[in-house]
Amino acid sequence: MKYLTKFIFIFLGLSFALLTQTHEMNPARLSLEEGANGSYSGLWMFPTNAVGLPAEVSFTNCNEEKRNLPEVQGKYLVSNIAINCDESLKGKEIAFKGLTRLTDALVSVKFLDQTSFEGLATINTPKFDIPQEVSI
């Protein structure tokens, strides 16, 4: 009986240890900064440990001026991105295609008027509108 009790505790301890191992939280990141005349430039960073192809990002009513092929930099595939919009990104939609349950996307936009926007896209909410009024 004594050995059975030890065995049960060891078995339960090992089972709990295996269950508590989690996947590393390593989200994709979109970082943009506003330039003159509705231009934005920044980085699209997608984790190298994600399953499948990198997710795609798109912007409503904006033209993509540049996006280089991704390069591995540390834990990320990094692409330089440049877009041109008729107006500010405020009030416009950003959409992601190809996010997974394990890969969310953090979005950070810095505007010329010193305001900024931070957002999160997930597989359940892959697109959102940047509000007209954003934080300082």
Task: Enumerate the predicted regions with their spans.
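N-terminal signal peptide c-region/cleavage motif recognized by signal peptidases
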Residues: 15-19
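Cleavable N-terminal signal peptides
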Residues: 9-10, 20
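Bacterial N-terminal signal peptides that target proteins for export
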Residues: 1-8
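Histidine-/acidic- and/or cysteine-rich, low-complexity loops and terminal segments associated
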Residues: 21-136
